[in-house]
Structures are given as C-alpha cells and as structure tokens.
Amino acid sequence: VQVHAAHGWLFSQFLSPYYNKRTDEFGGSLENRARFFVKAVEAVREAVGPAFPIEARISGDDLSDTGIGMDECIEVAKMLDGKVDLINVSCGNHEDPALFCRTHPSAFFKRGVNVYLAAEIKKHVKTPVACVGSLNDPAQMEEIIAGGESDYVEIGRALVADPYIPEKALRDEAEDITPCLRCYECFGETVQCENIKCAVNPKIGLQLFSRNGFAPAAEKKRVLVAGGGPAGMQAAITLAGRGHEVTLVEKADKLGGNLHPAGAAYFKRDIAKFCQVLINRVHKA
C-alpha cells in the first residue's frame, strides 16, 4: 500500500503551510500539519497488520518558497520512521505547472535530477528510502544504490517505454533497453482518461496477449519495407518477429532517418540512443 503525500495531493496540501490555513489540531505547526498524514499511515498499518508492506511517498522539497521545504520534509520523514517499510522521496507540486517538469523530469534535466533529495532524507531515518526521477539506465541505478544515496530505485515512465528493463538488466542486455524520451505522450492520454500511449513502445497495452505483443503470422510472406527511418525499422522488426522474410531498403547510407537530426542536441540524446536501439534490433532481426 502506498500512502501518497507528495505532489500537491490531499496529504501534501495538509503538510504545506501555503495550503493549510487550519487553526485546529491539523494546522499551524508542522506536527499539526502532519497529523492527518501520520494518522492515515497508522490507520493503514492497523488495517493491514505488521507484515504487510507500506510505502509512504513524500516530497523531499516542494521547490516553492511558500511550500514545505527540505528541512520540514526531513522532519516528516522522521515522523514516519518505523511506521512504514519504505519512504519514497519525490519533489514538486502539481498545482504549479512550472514544477511539473521537475516532479516528472523533462529531457532538459539530467537523469536522476531528484536523487539528491532521497540521499538527504536517508541520512536522517532508519527506514529504507527509495529515489525517483527520470531514471532509465541500470548502471546509474546500481551506482546510486552502491553509493549509498538510496536503498531502492523506483521507475515509472521508463517501464512504459520498456516493461522489461529489470529483466534486461539482469541478463546484461542494457543496450537493448528502449529509452524513455520524456516526451510526456503518456501523460496526455492519462489526462484524457484513455488507454496509455507511448511514443517509443508500439506494444503498450498488448503484453497481456503475448510477450511480444503480436502473434506469429498464420502465413509467412516475403515483405519489402521501403525506408529505414523509425517507422520503417519498427515495421521491419515487427514483421520479422511475426515470422516474415523481410527486406528493408533505405536510400541514405545509414538507417535512422530523421532521428539523427532530431537527436543531435545535447538534451535530445535519448532520441539518438533510441535510434541506435532500433538499428541494433534491425540487424538482429
């Protein structure tokens, strides 16, 4: 069970001096502002028992002059110490659109931009701590844990782009991980309450039908795919995966098409990586 008290949701609003203007036992001092959240955690523990895992998600910093800062977030974490099994440390506030791209880091931020918050919280509690924030590379995740910055690493959008990241990391196949481009395509569909979509994972939502998302073809055919851009490469990969004999032709001297100029800027390196992943899969197919 995760009890979410970050990002401007209800518990987060109680914690924040900006939103919480109450004058009773649930407002004023930090102890009072945290009372509702702590009582909820205690009620969950009473309901599920001592052996059931509970995660509390908090902000390490609202990143706002008027919100709850790191010092108070540390004190909230101390209040949770021993009451939960894991403290998940995020940041930001959905009420401020400018902070959305820090809560869910965009491509303009380095991978793991929010890890420092979990690392600071970890210094003050005995409960295991998890970090979040635009993590995609197993090597970086291992470095974070080995360096003592966090006990666990949690990923969200990265698993939408490639649900098999843990398995590929275990098999030492990190080079085949489809990188999340941090383009927010998945968020747009979530807001519209539609099936989630992903710019780099055409199989999203189809994993229940088969691991590869597409069943083998009933009849093997010889197929010509014209154009070695991202669409052409993915078409060739999918066709080959279904058992067809595929020929992929491209007029340029390299595969990738517009992914090359699209991934040229320093903050678009994920696109360049995605291009190379597709090229590798074409050669393997």
Identify the function of each model-found stretch.
Residues V1-A226, P230, Q234-V246, K254:
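Flavin-dependent oxidoreductase catalytic cores
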Residues L224-K284:
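Beta1-alpha1 glycine-rich phosphate/pyrophosphate-binding loop at the start
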